[in-house]
Amino acid sequence: ALTNYRRRHLGYVFQMYNLIPNLNVKENIEVGAYLSDKSLDIDELLKTLGLYEHRHKLPNQLSGGQQQRTAIGRAIVKNPDILLCDEPTGALDYNTSKEILKLIEDVNQKYGNTVIMVTHNDAIKNMADRVIKLRDGQIRKDYTNEVKIPAQELDW
């Protein structure tokens, strides 16, 4: 039952992209589509991700940001209710990090899924509806942002 729930309702974006090296961008995203009966149109998603022109490239032919966008695509193609992001910008430079955060924000607005993001970057909390801060496995703060800052306006 738990496996079926995860398969149908959850999408995961990892810090390390976990792309399949011998599959191209489109095929890596299609892997996620096979897990759902409510998957999104892959070509439309590739365009949303800014990857349509790169769809036939292998992961080793992509920049870090393109690889992360591919990983995000694989997670959201199955149209999950909840998207879990573990340090989605951890291995990326400042500008690429902001692009990825903007993409996650856009995907959230376009598809209406809940995004749960784990990050050590304190500035990212400003784009969230709700912030839960943990330390040593304990909740230290739990609050709602009255005014969210769009991803493109974040600075760190």
Predicted segments, located by residue:
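ABC ATPase NBD coupling module
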Residues: 1-11, 149-153
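Conserved ABC ATPase signature
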Residues: 4, 58-68
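Short coil-to-helix segment of the ABC ATPase nucleotide-binding domain corresponding to the Q-loop/switch region
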Residues: 23-30
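Conserved ABC ATPase "signature" region
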Residues: 38-53
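Hydrophobic anchor residue at the start of the ABC signature
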Residues: 72
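Conserved catalytic motifs of ABC-family nucleotide-binding domains
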Residues: 79
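Catalytic Walker B motif of ABC-type/P-loop ATPase nucleotide-binding domains
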Residues: 83-86
